[in-house]
Amino acid sequence: MHRGVGPAFRVVRKMAASGAEPQVLVQYLVLRKDLSQAPFSWPAGALVAQACHAATAALHTHRDHPHTAAYLQELGRMRKVVLEAPDETTLKELAETLQQKNIDHMLWLEQPENIATCIALRPYPKEEVGQYLKKFRLFK
C-alpha cells in the first residue's frame, strides 16, 4: 500500500536538500534483563516478543506524531536500540521519569500476570532522550 509522502518526511528531505543534517530518529527500548535469569528464566523468544509488543504499541499509539511518521517513511533505515534494565523496579522508575518529563513511551505489561516487561519510546532524535537512558547498557 502506497501512502504518499507525508509532511514529516518532506521536512526531513528538505533539511537534507538544504545541506542541514537530517535528524536521525531512533526508537529506544528498555527490556528487563532479570526475566532471562532465575527465578524467571524466560526464553529468548519470549523476551524478544515483549520488546516487539512494546515497540509496536508505541508506534501505533504515537502514529500521528511527525517523528513517528518520518521514521515509518524510511522502512529500510529504521533504527532501534535495545537497552537492559536490571529489574522491574528500575523499569518502573524509568517509566515514571519519562512520564514526568513528557517523553512519549509505552510501558508494556504482560497479561494476564500484569508484569512490566519493556518500555518503548516513540522514535526520537537521540539528543532529546539520551540523558534519560545513558545509565542503561545495551541488552546482551
UniProtKB/Swiss-Prot annotation:
Protein origin, superkingdom: Eukaryota
Enzyme nomenclature, EC number: 3.1.1.29
GO molecular function: peptidyl-tRNA hydrolase activity
Cross-referenced InterPro entries: Pep_tRNA_hydro_II_dom_sf (IPR023476), PTH2 (IPR002833), PTRHD1 (IPR042237)
UniProtKB keywords: Hydrolase, Intellectual disability, Parkinsonism
Keyword Acetylation appears in the UniProt entry: no
Consequence of substituting R122W: In NEDPBA; uncertain significance
Record bears the keyword Hydrolase: yes
Catalysed conversion reaction: an N-acyl-L-alpha-aminoacyl-tRNA + H2O = an N-acyl-L-amino acid + a tRNA + H(+)
Coiled-coil residues: none
Any one cellular-component term (Gene Ontology): mitochondrion
Pfam family, one: PTH2
Function comment: As a putative peptidyl-tRNA hydrolase, it might be involved in releasing tRNAs from the ribosome during protein synthesis. Some evidence, however, suggests that it lacks peptidyl-tRNA hydrolase activity.
Disease linked to the protein: Neurodevelopmental disorder with early-onset parkinsonism and behavioral abnormalities: An autosomal recessive disorder manifesting in late infancy or early childhood. It is characterized by developmental delay, intellectual disability, learning difficulties, behavioral abnormalities, and parkinsonism and spasticity usually developing in the third or fourth decades.
Protein family: Belongs to the PTH2 family. PTRHD1 subfamily.
Protein name, as recorded: Putative peptidyl-tRNA hydrolase PTRHD1
Organism from which the protein derives: Homo sapiens (Human)
